[in-house]
């Protein structure tokens, strides 16, 4: 029987990975560590798909970590994620449990599964000024020239792209110091969802979250003093809803552009996960359409080495 330190559940948006991870954690009497870069933030709930109800299974609350740990407007980074992941991981292991890591942010997942040695990167005003007038397309092309560590799935705004280039430039000049990060042997389970079903679920989920008050959530964040630029930085829902709230898009334009952007994002997530396989990770894929009991049985079999 393989000796795993961790179970990782990954998959694109709307694949049902969170209810799957919660049901598995319930079965194994363990806890979940979040690996979604935007669910880190308090008050950013509907826009990040933070379905906290998923963390209750058969009336039992499943403990979760790294959700609601930073204020909106803050630029949380992968260096901090590694640090916070380790604290959560060790606290779960001390209870004698096998942690479940769940999310779709490829860079966060890979940073802990591979144990990248990272360090905080300061802002570079000169570089920012030089890149300020470039389009997102031009910045993406610049970013492609690096042997990049950066998560291209999240580079969907000019600010994010400039920050990604800033990080790459810094690492090019400053050798990364050795920093201890434990080698983790994770069983990695990928949730495979049919493309058309994924598209249908994304659209249905978007309409549902808009009905539940996603626009009001963005308005509330701006009323709390979060600048439109800071919200746009988070991309996807926050980018397009903010543009609608400040009058730059009509409701119809916002919906159409956001729907398209989420579909593209899910496609980029799958590209990242396939890239992980090329980089040496073994991902055991399970169909999103299987009944929950069968998905859990699949994981239990893999844990036993079958």
Q: What residue ranges belong to the model's regions?
A:
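Phosphate/pyrophosphate-binding catalytic cores of soluble transferases and nucleic-acid-acting enzymes
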Residues: 1-306
């Amino acid at each position: 029987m393989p000796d795993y330190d961790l179970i990782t559940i990954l998959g694109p948006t709307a694949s049902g990975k969170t209810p799957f991870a919660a049901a598995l954690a319930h079965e194994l009497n363990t806890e979940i560590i979040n690996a979604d870069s935007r669910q880190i933030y308090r008050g950013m709930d509907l826009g990040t798909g933070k379905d906290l109800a998923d963390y209750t299974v058969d009336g039992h609350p499943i403990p979760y970590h790294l959700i609601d740990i930073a204020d909106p407007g803050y630029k949380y980074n992968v260096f901090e994620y590694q640090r916070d992941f380790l604290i959560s991981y060790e606290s779960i292991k001390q209870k004698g449990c096998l942690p479940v890591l769940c999310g779709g942010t490829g860079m966060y997942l890979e940073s802990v599964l591979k144990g990248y040695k990272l360090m905080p990167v300061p802002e570079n005003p000169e570089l920012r000024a030089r890149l300020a007038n470039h389009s997102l397309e031009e910045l993406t092309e610049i970013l492609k020239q690096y042997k990049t560590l950066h998560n291209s799935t999240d580079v969907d705004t000019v600010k994010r792209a400039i920050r990604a280039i800033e990080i790459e430039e810094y690492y090019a000049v400053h050798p990364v110091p050795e920093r201890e990060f434990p080698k983790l042997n994770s069983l990695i389970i990928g949730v495979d969802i049919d493309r058309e079903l994924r598209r249908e679920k994304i659209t249905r989920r978007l309409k549902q979250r808009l009905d539940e008050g996603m626009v009001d959530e963005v308005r509330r964040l701006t009323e709390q003093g979060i600048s439109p630029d800071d919200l746009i930085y988070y991309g996807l829902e926050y980018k397009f809803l903010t543009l609608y709230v400040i009058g730059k898009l009509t409701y119809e334009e916002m919906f159409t552009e956001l729907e398209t952007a989420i579909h593209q994002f899910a496609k980029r997530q799958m590209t990242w996960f396939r890239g992980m396989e090329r980089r040496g990770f073994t991902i055991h894929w399970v169909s999103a359409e299987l009944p929950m009991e069968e998905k859990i049985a699949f994981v239990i079999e893999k844990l036993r080495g079958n």
